[in-house]
Amino acid sequence: MAGGWIKVHRKLLENSLWENCTAEQKVIFITLLLMANHEEKEWIFKGEKYICKPGQFVTSLKSIQEKVGKDISIMQIRRSLEKFEVYQFLTSESTNKNRLITIENWGLYQEKEDVPTDKPTSNRQATDN
């Protein structure tokens, strides 16, 4: 999970969830996208081996707070997760220590595709302007 990037489409600005979020909730929203696994990863969850799929991750409220910053409280994070569930952005399954978060429709928005390079394609000439 340490490397890579995520896609954030401009259409997000028109999304009702985004429009109804506070600045703090938007920080949490983007942070959750950044925390999600981009490929399968093995975890132990509720005492059992679990394979986290792309768009899922195991975390805690405290861990989210460490990533978003101390200015955002655990209560704000908890309320944001509840709001994100109502808007069907994510699902959150918690135990007394950890929480499995699944970003809904992850594959639809974050599917791997060819990454553009600075190199010209074979059917296009390079120019020196």
Q: Model-derived features: where do they sit?
A:
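Charged low-complexity intrinsically disordered patches
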Residues: 105-129
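Short helix-coil-helix linker/hinge
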Residues: 22-25
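Short alpha-helical "packing" element that flanks the helix-turn-helix/winged-helix DNA-binding module
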Residues: 28-32
